[in-house]
Amino acid sequence: MVNGKYLVEKLIVYAKSFLYLAETDEIYMRNCLLASLRLSSPLSEVPNLDFIKEMSVPDVLFDEIKDYSRENAIASDDTQATLFAASVFGMLTQKPSEINTTFSYLKEKMGAQAACDYLYNLSVMNNYIQKTAISKNLLWEYRDGDNVLEITINLSKPEKDNKDIMKLAKAPVDGEKYPKCALCPENEGYLGSYTHPPRSNLRTVSLTLGGEDWSLQYSPYAYFNEHCIVFNKHHTPMRMTRQTITKLFDFIDILPNYFVGSNSDLPIVGGSILNHEHYQGGRHEMPMHKAKPRYTLTSEKFPDVEISILNWYNSAIRLTGYNKNTICELGGDIVDAWKAYSDESVGIINSAEERHNTCTPIARYLSDSKFCLEIILRNNITTEEYPDGVFHAHPEYHNIKKEGIGLIEAMGLYILPGRLKKQIEQIADILCGDAPFCPEKIEPTDPLYVHKKMITELKEVNPDLDDREKALEIIRKRINETCVHILENTAVFKTNETGTLAFRRFLNTLSIK
């Protein structure tokens, strides 16, 4: 049984140590905690709790709150217990006004990174960023010639199907739904429910991008270092326009220590949330950022901008220079031109009735004081042969990755579904002969059914395998190669001669040669 009075004192010490609880607020906060835990009085004598000050994450305390809520009929199940624990940490966390004031002060006095450190660490220590759960994700790098892919098996976020994402994008806004979606500003401090994750402990800071009101928060899933989400304060759909480029660079002006990018505004080639305009960024050098130019080009209209087609798997253009305004102008021209472009000789079909072309732009401030804009060209057309998308992961790779390839993965950081962790172990058992496998008898309901073809091929090539580590290495190699092929699938202009000529034809329409 959890001692509630003892728990209250531990939470007070924790909040004073990590969540900026002031001495003058200690009695007030203790009474708030007593009320929440349904206690009438605190401990008469407070024991030594210095060990609390050594904590690096709040997991133990969060779990104690959950246990206490179940033991004392405050919560009837795990979901309610989680919501309650998050609400307690929300109570312990500074109010949004205080957070914004401190963030602005630190940014002005100590710089952008100090301000970001403050908000990030607060979000870890109030359990919004669930650092322990994130640390369980599997992560490795794959070097492929001049390029490197970062591959993670995500154990904290469920896999989404493209068809579900399309339904969400087209769904009418329900006036009764509150908050309207997971990105709306009304999430800040929201208790949550059985269908909505707890957001009592969420804190954001306000930004102005393109003259509009936006907010910044950190991602609870944190796919990379200081992974942040930047969202419009109004519930408005994703859109890809010239103004998108301007807003990305407005963000870079505020936080030059981060990159920032926008998912595209169309299903299949966009992110999982299309009904609320948002960007993603953070303090991480993405694999695509390390890619070298394949070709260097020039613009007649913007001679001060360095232009290159990247030596990368998908169709990416890099613009760099010291003049942010000319980069924004040229970037806007590329976005507008691509949205209206067609070239049926390479399968790029676009029409006024149904637009298929869009972009994935990413802005950065480089160490040599140059501005950088990378634009990945995207197309979401479907056919009978490829009903999930011509420039999407082809069906033979869906056993590894079926979700749309959004901003993060298009830059070479793969987020693979958590189901793969167990399935890799099971496939290793089969390859080593420790588990039976008969492709003719495997049922569609079997989790390994989706891997039937891959397992058969791997067994044929490695018939007498008895080294488990070797088996795991073989499976991982297959996953690595699949990730490369998926990115190649997303390229609207393939890297062969035909694709390269087609790419340059498009750029010629902008007088880029």
Model-predicted regions and their roles:
Residues E226-N232, G270-M286, I376:
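Histidine-centered divalent-metal-coordination microenvironment in nucleic-acid enzymes
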Residues M1-P237, N311-N314, C328-G331, A337-K513:
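Active-site microenvironments that recognize anionic phosphate/pyrophosphate groups
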Residues G211, P220-Y223, H227-D265:
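Secondary-structure-rich domain cores
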Residues L216, V260, E277-Y279:
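Hydrophobic faces of well-ordered beta-strands that scaffold small-molecule active sites
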Residues Q243, I252, P256-S272, G281-V335, ...:
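Catalytic or ion-translocation cores adjacent to nucleophile or general acid/base/metal-coordination motifs
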Residues P267-N275, E353-T358:
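Beta-rich nucleic-acid/ligand-interaction surfaces
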